[in-house]
Swiss-Prot record:
Binding, substrate: 9-11, 172, 212, 233-234
This protein's pathway: Carbohydrate biosynthesis; gluconeogenesis; Carbohydrate degradation; glycolysis; D-glyceraldehyde 3-phosphate from glycerone phosphate: step 1/1
UniProt protein name: Triosephosphate isomerase
CDD domains to which the protein is assigned, alphabetical: TIM
Keyword field contains Isomerase: yes
Lineage top rank: taxon: Bacteria
Quaternary assembly: Homodimer.
Family affiliation: Belongs to the triosephosphate isomerase family.
GO molecular function, one term: triose-phosphate isomerase activity
Length: 250
């Protein structure tokens, strides 16, 4: 039985003080959660949020990292820096990173491998654009991302990996894939992973849905057999909304 995982991606929102206020509001609301709870603040707030969540059931994730150990990469964050802070998760390949910062699958594959070297659980984002969905090439697009991003990982690493399926057309648009659409696509993702790494690893891997997830939609999504959680954007910026999603089973 896979344990659900709900992760909040704050994106470029919340100063350190605002983030700490949000965490303090959130702590009592999710203390009895039956799922893994992760918050992903901006890089500058990671240290403060890790300290603020010590001794709680809230884990902290980063929104990105570099694939090199160190070096002349101005403005970047090394995996060892995240590990030393006590960060446990890292979002890799978010569609905004792919779209605005030119991230590609070859670099993401390096990042995946580097995350495991530094005890960071990757939340790998994959997804198709509206044009790709309307052209009926969703499965081809996702299969290519999966094959390139996961190449060379071990079965044990695959079992630990979290994939977030985020249809790009549903991010921040208010549009949401129906729960049936999400389930069908996520089942395909799991099948593709099984073809590469075997059914056992694929069955252990947790796959989230991301794309305008709200308290009103989470219950129906989580009732589906292949959906193991959510990567939450806008709704993670309000403690009550995020807690309502985290406590979807109550």
């Amino acid at each position: 039985m896979r344990k659900a995982i709900i992760a909040g991606n704050w994106k470029m929102n919340n100063t350190i003080s605002q983030g700490l206020k949000l965490v303090e509001e959130l702590k009592p609301l999710v203390a009895d959660a039956n799922c893994d709870v992760v918050v992903c603040p901006p890089t500058l707030a990671l240290d403060a949020v890790v300290k603020a969540t010590e001794g709680t059931n809230i884990k902290v994730g980063a929104q990105n990292m570099h694939f090199e150990e160190s070096g002349a990469f101005t403005g970047e964050t090394a995996p060892a820096m995240l590990e030393e802070l006590g960060v446990k998760y890292v979002i890799l390949g978010h569609s905004e990173r792919r779209q605005y910062f030119g991230e590609n699958d070859a670099d993401l594959n390096k990042k995946m491998k580097k995350a495991f070297e530094h005890n960071l659980t990757p939340i790998l984002c994959i997804g198709e654009t509206l044009e790709e969905r309307e052209a009926d090439v969703t499965e081809e697009v996702l299969a290519k991302q999966i094959k390139l991003d996961l190449a060379g990982l071990t079965e044990a690493q695959i079992a630990e990996t979290v994939i977030a399926y985020e249809p790009i057309w549903a991010i921040g648009t208010g549009k949401t894939a129906t729960s049936d659409q999400a389930e069908e696509t996520i089942a395909f993702v799991r099948k593709t992973v099984a073809g590469m790494f075997g059914a056992e690893a694929a069955e252990k891997m947790r796959i989230q849905y991301g794309g305008s997830v709200k308290p009103a939609t989470i219950k129906e999504q989580m009732a589906k057999p292949n959906i193991d959680g959510g990567l939450i954007g806008g709704a993670s910026l309000k403690a009550a909304d995020f807690a309502a999603i985290v406590n979807f089973d109550k």
